[in-house]
C-alpha cells in the first residue's frame, strides 16, 4: 500500500511540470512561430549562483552558529573565563543535608499500598479441595403453579332489566414445569 502511494507520488512529481507547461501555453502546438518569453527586467533580481550556494540555509547545520560578539552581549553564551574560575577554586564542602529527589514527596506517613483485587493470588489451602457444585440428575422436577387471569363473558337474560354483558375475571392455576438442571 505504501509502496504504491510512493510510486504514484513520484509519477505525479515527474509529470506535473510538463502538464503545467502545457496548460500555460495551450496553443503552442498550433503556432509555427518561436515562443519568446520576455521578462520584465525591473522585477527580476540578479542573484549570482555562487552566493546562493554559499548561503547558510543550504548547508547542513552540524553545529550552532555563534556570532563573535562581546561577552556582555548575551547572558546565555558560554564564557571560558567563568569556567576556568570555577575549575580553579577550592572544592565545595560536602553538604550534610540529604539530597532531595526531583519529584515531590508526600509529607505524611508512608502507607502500605493494598494489592488490587484483580490480582488475587491462590493460597495453598484452596488447592487441595476444589469446590465443584454437585448436581443430582435424579432430582424430581417441581412444577410451580402460576395464576393466570382469563376473562369469561356471562350473558345474563333478566326479563326485568335490559340485557347487559358482564365481564368477570376468573383465576385458574396452570402447572408450569421448570427445567433447571
From Swiss-Prot:
One of its GO terms (cellular component) is extracellular region. Its main location: secreted. PANTHER family: KAPPA CASEIN, KAPPA-CASEIN. The record marks 118-119 as: Cleavage. Residues 1-21 form the signal peptide. This is Kappa-casein. The keyword Magnesium does not apply. InterPro entries: Casein_kappa. Kappa-casein stabilizes micelle formation, preventing casein precipitation in milk. It comes from the Eukaryota. It is found in: Secreted. The modification Phosphoserine is found at residues 162, 178. Mammary gland specific. Secreted in milk. GO terms for biological process: lactation. Belongs to the kappa-casein family. Glycans are attached at residues 134, 144, 155, 162. The modification Phosphothreonine is found at residue 123. Keywords: Glycoprotein, Milk protein, Phosphoprotein, Secreted, Signal. The gene is Csn3.
Amino acid at each position: 500500500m505504501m509502496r504504491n502511494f510512493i510510486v504514484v507520488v513520484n509519477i505525479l512529481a515527474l509529470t506535473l511540470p510538463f502538464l503545467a507547461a502545457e496548460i500555460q501555453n495551450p496553443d503552442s502546438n498550433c503556432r509555427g512561430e518561436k515562443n519568446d518569453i520576455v521578462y520584465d527586467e525591473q522585477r527580476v533580481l540578479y542573484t549570482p549562483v555562487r552566493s546562493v550556494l554559499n548561503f547558510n540555509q543550504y548547508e547542513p547545520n552540524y553545529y550552532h552558529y555563534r556570532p563573535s560578539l562581546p561577552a556582555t552581549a548575551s547572558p546565555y553564551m558560554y564564557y571560558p573565563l567563568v569556567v576556568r574560575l570555577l575549575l580553579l577554586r577550592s572544592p565545595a564542602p560536602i553538604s550534610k543535608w540529604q539530597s532531595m529527589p526531583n519529584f515531590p514527596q508526600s509529607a505524611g506517613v508512608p502507607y502500605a499500598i493494598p494489592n488490587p483485587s484483580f490480582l488475587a493470588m491462590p493460597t495453598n489451602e484452596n488447592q487441595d479441595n476444589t469446590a465443584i457444585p454437585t448436581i443430582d440428575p435424579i432430582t424430581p422436577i417441581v412444577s410451580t403453579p402460576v395464576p393466570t387471569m382469563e376473562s369469561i363473558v356471562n350473558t345474563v337474560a333478566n326479563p326485568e332489566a335490559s340485557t347487559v354483558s358482564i365481564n368477570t375475571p376468573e383465576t385458574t392455576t396452570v402447572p408450569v414445569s421448570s427445567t433447571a438442571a
